[in-house]
């Protein structure tokens, strides 16, 4: 949400409640995660996330596959909704190296771009640009393009080179996020090593299924700084059940170090599954880099 009185961007989190009304509300996606707070179905989760919406205030929706009852709930709230794929669009260039965002400005469609790809998803960038326009900010297209093309966010499709090896770090910890990670993986001529681990409330089997054959070798590390972490051996059994190759290690750090030892310059190492997983690897890289 955007709170203009406070001059701040406010992320509501999974409990979706703040003390002030929203000038602009954003629902980026609706999928299964945090079910203990939000509900057991996409329909329940969608309605829960709409707790950020306000009557006669802009609501920006980035979920292309709306769950049952979502549109009716938006109508009941009376928010001024704009939807990705309908009101807001992303147009990729032919070689997918850049994209253009189409937003609504005073009822008219406005293009911003082309912008070079960065570690943030074009759809989310489009939502952010629309949020600024909806909040009353005047955007300079050239400045937006230069700024966005240089953006990066730690742990979100973050690409780094470590000891000559291409490493991608992403905090994807549910099947929907794993699918997005898979769809945005670079094509390499070598192998893809996965360094992964998750907490106990995550759909690990669904994550493994989404990553599928895009991973050649799974290196499962034990998360040791959170009691909710699943046992690495249990995670490995799921990998084996899915007919994939893998092994487990006493720590995420050990799993990552082994992946770097085995990988060549033609390979890539992807790190995902939890904020704890990515954090452990970032610590290793900062100490050994």
Protein language model regions, located:
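Active-site-proximal loop/hinge segments that shape catalytic or ion-binding/gating pockets
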Residues: 274
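Acidic, Mg2+-coordinating active-site environments of NTP-dependent enzymes
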Residues: 1-11, 17, 22-112, 125-142
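Flexible, gly/pro- and Lys/Arg-enriched active-site loops
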Residues: 19, 30-37, 145-148, 219-239, ...
């Amino acid at each position: 949400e955007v709170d203009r009185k406070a001059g701040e961007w406010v992320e509501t989190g999974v409990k979706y409640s703040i003390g002030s009304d929203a000038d602009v509300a954003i629902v980026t996606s609706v999928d299964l995660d945090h079910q203990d707070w939000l509900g057991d179905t996409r329909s329940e989760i969608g309605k829960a996330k709409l707790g950020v919406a306000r009557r006669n205030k802009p609501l920006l929706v980035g979920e292309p596959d709306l769950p049952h009852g979502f549109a009716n709930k938006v109508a009941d709230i009376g928010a001024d909704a704009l939807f990705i794929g309908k009101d807001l669009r992303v147009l990729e260039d032919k070689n997918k190296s850049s994209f253009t965002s189409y937003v609504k400005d005073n009822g008219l469609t406005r293009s911003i771009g082309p912008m070079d790809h960065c570690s943030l998803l074009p759809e989310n960038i489009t939502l952010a640009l629309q949020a600024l326009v909806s909040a009353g900010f005047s955007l300079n297209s050239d400045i937006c393009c230069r700024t966005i093309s240089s953006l990066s966010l730690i742990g979100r499709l973050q690409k780094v080179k470590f000891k000559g090896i291409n490493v991608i770090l992403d905090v994807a910890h549910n099947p929907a996020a794993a699918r997005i990670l898979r769809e945005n993986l670079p094509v390499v001529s070598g192998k893809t090593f996965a360094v992964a681990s998750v907490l106990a409330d995550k759909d690990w089997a669904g994550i493994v299924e989404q990553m599928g054959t895009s991973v050649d070798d799974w290196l499962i590390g034990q998360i040791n700084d959170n009691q909710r972490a699943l046992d690495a051996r249990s995670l490995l059994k799921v990998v084996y059940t899915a007919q994939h190759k893998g092994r487990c290690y006493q720590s995420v750090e050990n799993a990552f170090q082994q992946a770097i030892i085995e990988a060549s310059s033609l390979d890539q190492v992807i790190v995902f599954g939890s904020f704890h997983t990515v954090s452990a690897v970032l610590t290793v890289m900062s100490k050994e880099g």
